């Protein structure tokens, strides 16, 4: 008799401890999963699961290529990228493609090439996905043992982990090679307002690179998000790439130690939960990085950070009122503190007013005006350059505070424009998606642990409480 639900609904997780189960196909009867449960039907069909993953990669790369070309088609060179709702072109520009001094776009052809290459790649991946999903072998273990696996085979799993780590390491080194040999990357700190340059003097000192990991995440410390020069970023990628590649080789050559065999759950769903947990961490870190860091995410392309827009406003009005005759060094604000300048808790001269909370901002347009004790009064009086005024006035009206209906900037700012900052989009999306992935991690970890411990999985469908309740209609 065909039941609407399967008694083996949660059975798949148990297959590790029961080698007798042979899956006949991809229907609910044989797998315990309906069509909408997606890849759960393919847990023991390595060939079909490969097809699903390759097809998924094809969709991802297709989106990248199509969205890339969409942004190129809509791009207006006269407007800054962050006013145009772009999220892909800023990444390409940061890598040094198509831009010149000050972050000005001088050539959109590299962006077009990037989009076309991704589209072509997606076609190859799409074909591979369809082939393995429909035509290729259901399982790889017999015909292609190198690509086959059994989820509970701990040695094979760490070998696969090692291969992934090596690929990640190669990815890190691709950025290093781009910065060192293939035209360089965009440096927002280059003198005169940012430029593309080759990174020649890498930071390889372990005390500096790993010092970032030991910093506090709060305030002026800012953990790894506080990195503010490209030498450290590219040097960090050398370290990271090396660690990933060496760790990958280690995991390929070794078998898991006894403590790891005991401590971890060795099932497909457990690996899924570990991966989701890692991606959640990545999402939360990426959120903080794109929101606060204006070196890895230059303000020329992504718009100013929140603290940067706030400090820019204070600077803009300091410039205006100083021209009108105000003595910015001694003017008193409504609270009795300095109106334009005041001292930080540690004694540096900082901007006064509400922006005092952002006193540890560092930005390329502001740093030339600092001395050994914070902002230098004589420089503020004599050395402010027109490009600094222009940059700060522009950033002041482009605070990353937009709402979904595109009323951008500070709500009370009469010069604000209809705009939502890419920083807002990227930070919010990565936080929200990171949170979803974290919930998925908890869900799948709980199921994997329950299966490993032999708990009852799910409620008994024959005596479900809802069956004894009055129908809604």
Curated annotation (Swiss-Prot):
* Residues of the propeptide: 1-14
Subunit structure, interactors included: PSII is composed of 1 copy each of membrane proteins PsbA, PsbB, PsbC, PsbD, PsbE, PsbF, PsbH, PsbI, PsbJ, PsbK, PsbL, PsbM, PsbT, PsbX, PsbY, PsbZ, Psb30/Ycf12, at least 3 peripheral proteins of the oxygen-evolving complex and a large number of cofactors. It forms dimeric complexes.
- Transmembrane region(s): 69-93, 134-155, 178-200, 255-275, 291-312, 447-471
Q: Which residues carry this modification: N-acetylthreonine?
A: 15
Q: What does this protein do?
A: One of the components of the core complex of photosystem II (PSII). It binds chlorophyll and helps catalyze the primary light-induced photochemical processes of PSII. PSII is a light-driven water:plastoquinone oxidoreductase, using light energy to abstract electrons from H(2)O, generating O(2) and a proton gradient subsequently used for ATP formation.
A single GO molecular function term of this UniProt record: electron transporter, transferring electrons within the cyclic electron transport pathway of photosynthesis activity
Protein name according to UniProt = Photosystem II CP43 reaction center protein
Cofactor comment text: Binds multiple chlorophylls and provides some of the ligands for the Ca-4Mn-5O cluster of the oxygen-evolving complex. It may also provide a ligand for a Cl- that is required for oxygen evolution. PSII binds additional chlorophylls, carotenoids and specific lipids.
Q: Which residues carry this modification: Phosphothreonine?
A: 15
Keyword list, A-Z: Acetylation, Chlorophyll, Chloroplast, Chromophore, Manganese, Membrane, Metal-binding, Phosphoprotein, Photosynthesis, Photosystem II, Plastid, Thylakoid, Transmembrane, Transmembrane helix
Q: What is its main location?
A: plastid
Subcellular location per UniProt equals: Plastid, Chloroplast thylakoid membrane
Record-stated family:
Belongs to the PsbB/PsbC family. PsbC subfamily.
Protein topology in the membrane: Multi-pass membrane protein
Source taxonomy lineage? Eukaryota, Viridiplantae, Streptophyta, Embryophyta, Tracheophyta
Biological process terms from the Gene Ontology for this record are: photosynthetic electron transport in photosystem II
User: Per its UniProt record, what InterPro entries does this chain match?
Assistant: PS_antenna-like (IPR000932), PS_II_antenna-like_sf (IPR036001), PSII_PsbC (IPR005869), PSII_PsbC_sf (IPR044900)
Write out the GO cellular component annotations: chloroplast thylakoid membrane; photosystem II
**Chain positions recorded as [CaMn4O5] cluster binding sites:** 367
